[in-house]
């Protein structure tokens, strides 16, 4: 209907940088998943066209700014939906092109939206959820690398292995803590450096407390996985349709608070992996434990690894700023009807930056070992 088409066009008011292609693919996938449950009131042809987009890598151009994270991700999902109507732009075969031309090239007719379909496409948390899923996958990888780099740093710093023994962690049985301690022991098994007698009694916290800090981040990742698994297997549309009960309910499943909180939490957990890693880097270049200052033979003549630590510190500081929770803010909109919003989209895009930052900090730590 004309109303549904107008809804899509009027809500396509996003701005800022483009959403990365891998995130757009996830948005499409998650929207297809949500609509497939049959509580959204859409025609089969609309869902099939979204599947066509996904399978043929026809990726709508979507922008990062514009969603309040309640009433769903209205602006980003409007941009996702425009190409269904032959409007907007898509990325296809590596180039951004008008959607109408790509649809014509592929022999696809624009979809004529029926009653409720515009709302079904615009309402939903798929923008936030796509960022969350991407970040979760990256978090697992970065958590594993943080343990490996932490173990190598401990070895290089002539650290003690005793704080990583099972006995210590079984009396404070956080799952992530125990897992991390065992990872470190396994990674350093057979090392002559870690096994040799030590002069010092204790290591700095950034080494000694690897299980407690890395472990807490692991437990956070597990929690966020549970939240996102529930979210992406849900209907987050409004109003929701129950055909068997002959019932349509206007409710609030579009509100992004569950994942907004989770993504803020995950950003903090990942930033801490970067923060503690940078501190170990600093210790390695400090001239302690018979290591040369800045890890260079002639520190007066050469700067060695002095400036890479500056870079890591700068990135860590930026991540700390990005960890200000987005979900604590709410600005009323729609003449006060939408008087509490999650700001989950801001949590999502900040989380993306924290993930990238943490990867860079870990890479910088690795080159110091």
Ranges and model annotations:
Residues 130, 166-170, 209, 250-251, ...:
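Short beta-alpha connecting loops at secondary-structure transitions
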Residues 154-275:
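Accessory "access/gating" subregions that flank catalytic or transport cores
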Residues 367-369:
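Conserved small/polar residues in nucleotide/adenosyl-binding loops
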Residues 70-79, 224, 228-327, 333-334:
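Glycine-rich anion/phosphate-binding loop at the beta-strand->alpha-helix junction
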Residues 12-20, 24-171:
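Active-site cavity-forming subdomains of large catalytic enzyme subunits
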Residues 44, 71-74, 125, 136, ...:
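Conserved structured core elements
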Residues 2-11:
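Active-site-surrounding "flap" and adjacent substrate/cofactor-binding loops of secreted or lumenal enzymes
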């Amino acid at each position: 209907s004309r109303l549904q088409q107008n809804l899509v066009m009027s809500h396509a008011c996003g701005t800022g940088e483009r959403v990365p292609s891998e995130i757009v693919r996830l948005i499409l996938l998650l929207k297809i998943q949500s609509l497939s449950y049959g509580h959204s009131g859409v025609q089969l042809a609309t869902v099939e066209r979204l599947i066509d987009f996904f399978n043929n890598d026809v990726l709508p151009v979507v922008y990062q700014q514009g969603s309040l994270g309640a009433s769903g991700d209205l602006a980003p999902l409007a941009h996702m939906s425009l190409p269904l109507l032959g409007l907007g732009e898509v990325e296809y075969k590596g180039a951004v092109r008008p959607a109408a031309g790509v649809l014509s090239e592929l022999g696809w007719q624009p979809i004529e939206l029926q009653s409720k379909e515009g709302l079904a496409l615009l309402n939903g948390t798929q923008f936030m959820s796509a960022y969350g899923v991407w970040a979760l996958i990256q978090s697992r990888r970065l958590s594993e690398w943080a343990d490996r780099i932490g173990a190598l740093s401990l070895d290089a710093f002539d650290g003690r292995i005793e704080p990583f023994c099972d006995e210590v962690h079984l009396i404070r049985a956080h799952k992530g803590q125990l897992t991390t301690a065992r990872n470190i022991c396994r990674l350093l098994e057979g090392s002559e450096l870690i096994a040799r007698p030590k002069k010092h009694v204790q290591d700095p916290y950034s080494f000694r407390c690897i299980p407690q800090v890395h472990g807490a981040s692991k437990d956070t990742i597990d929690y966020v996985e549970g939240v996102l698994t529930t979210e992406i297997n849900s209907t987050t549309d409004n109003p929701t349709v129950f055909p068997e009960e002959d019932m349509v309910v206007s409710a609030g499943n579009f509100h992004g608070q569950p994942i907004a909180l989770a993504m803020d939490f995950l950003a903090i957990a990942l930033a801490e992996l970067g923060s503690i890693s940078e501190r170990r880097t600093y210790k390695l270049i400090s001239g302690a434990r018979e290591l040369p200052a800045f890890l260079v033979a002639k520190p007066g003549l050469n700067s060695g690894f002095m400036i890479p630590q500056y870079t890591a510190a700068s990135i860590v500081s930026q991540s700390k700023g990005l960890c200000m929770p987005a979900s604590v803010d709410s600005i009323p909109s729609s003449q006060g009807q939408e008087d509490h919003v999650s700001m989950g989209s801001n949590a999502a895009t900040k989380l993306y930056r924290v993930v990238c930052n943490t990867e860079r900090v870990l890479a910088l730590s690795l080159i110091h070992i």
